[in-house]
Amino acid sequence: MFDLPTVAPIDMEDSWVTFQAEGEQGQDSFSSSVNLDDSLTSLQWLQEFSILNANVGKAPSSGDSHGYKHLFGAPCSPLAADPACLGMPHTPGKPISSSTSRASHLGLQPMEDIDYKTNPHVKPPYSYATLICMAMQASKKTKITLSAIYKWITDNFCYFRHADPTWQNSIRHNLSLNKCFIKVPREKDEPGKGGFWKIDPQYADRLMNGAMKKRRLPPVQIHPAFASAQAAASGNSNRGSPWQLSVNSESHQLLKEFEEATGEQGWNALGEHGWNAISDGKSHKRKQPLPKRMFKAPRLSSSPMLCQEEQTELGSLKGDFDWEVIFDSSMNGVNFSAFEDLEVTPPLSPVTRSVDLTVHGKHIDCPQQWYPLGQDQAVVQNSLDFDETFLATSFLQHPWEENRNDYLSNSANIEQLFDLNEEFPAELNDWSALGSYI
């Protein structure tokens, strides 16, 4: 086991007596300090404070309730002695800035009575551009150096002799950026270094009158061509509706040439029905919706699916045509009046390889576009439309021979068609008795 340190009873008694003595002495000093230093937390000075006795230069009264002896220039309140409170107003209301408090001992003076040559505390109420202009005019020369401008400013204004030399940077910036000043290069025969500066004659009067205190950017100049185009665009936008399409004269002329060039190929239909030109004197066109298609447009002979020979053979089908006139002219008087009640419908399936495409004894191979394998819907529709026209043409060029036997009679007879294995009764030979079986 560890041995615990033991303290002698005599030492403990001595330390306890010493502690009690120190405690009694501290209590006495604390009570005395409370009685003496009670003024540190007292606000009685705030009640006695007034504006009349707040003057620093006023001599303090001999009688003091707290027994303090005021010296000349001593603060009239405990807070005034704090370094953080220096420069702050002693009374609420009007705050005092640091710049005005430094010159408060000089008193308030009018601006006309201030001598800027001898007063180092007041900054001249002039801009840097005005100071430069004053220095140039005082020199009685057409051009002046930068060092001469510095010298004239420091000679006539004491403030700049004692101020921070950063004001010289402001002078250089004004000379470089302000358009009222022009830099004149030094001649080769002139002694010294650096260039000269002078006032632009067109801005001299305005600068002296105080109109050019601040450097202003010149107004943005717009080219006359862009200005006229912008004005025309704004005028058109005000007159036209948001859905109105504006077309200039050049585009209008190109559109006319395009319609004339494509008129022979049938594009004139689009020009007549797709666009309705509504002229208001300014070459405007408004797009109108296409009218509802009530009839099927005739097939054009310039279809890309027909070769040159087929287009020659289909010459009679160009434009609008009448079936009866074509039938009468092609068949030389053959009566096809029954076709008036015939409704021509497109075939249910595309043309296959077995279709006879012989025209005037010449065989034409079926184009690859007619095959149904691997075709999209648009190609199938085009082939259906072409089949209708081509079959009608082939029928007109070589009609079926009259001595041709019926297709139904060649393929099957009556007995095979109705599957009749027995002979008809004798009484069925009489056609009059056939009605009883029906």
UniProtKB/Swiss-Prot annotation:
Q: Which GO terms describe its cellular component?
A: nucleus
What InterPro entries is this protein classified in? FH_FOXJ1, Fork_head_dom, FOXJ1, TF_fork_head_CS_1, TF_fork_head_CS_2, WH-like_DNA-bd_sf, WH_DNA-bd_sf
Asked whether the keyword NAD is assigned, the reply is no
Q: Tell me, what does this protein do in biology?
A: Key transcription factor required for motile ciliogenesis. Activates genes essential for motile cilia formation and function.
Organism, as annotated:
Xenopus tropicalis
Enumerate the subcellular locations listed in this protein's record, separating them with semicolons.
Answer: Nucleus
Tell me which positions the record assigns to the signal sequence: none
Q: Which GO terms describe its molecular function?
A: DNA-binding transcription factor activity; sequence-specific DNA binding
Q: Name the principal localization, coarsely classed.
A: nucleus
SMART domains linked: FH
What processes does the entry annotate via GO biological process terms? axoneme assembly; ciliary basal body organization; cilium assembly; determination of left/right symmetry; protein localization
| UniProt key word Transport | no
Q: Which domain of life is it from?
A: Eukaryota
Where's DNA bound on this chain? 123-217
Q: Which family does it belong to?
A: Belongs to the FOXJ1 family.
Q: Which UniProt keywords apply?
A: Activator, Cilium biogenesis/degradation, DNA-binding, Nucleus, Transcription, Transcription regulation
User: What protein is this chain from?
Assistant: Forkhead box protein J1
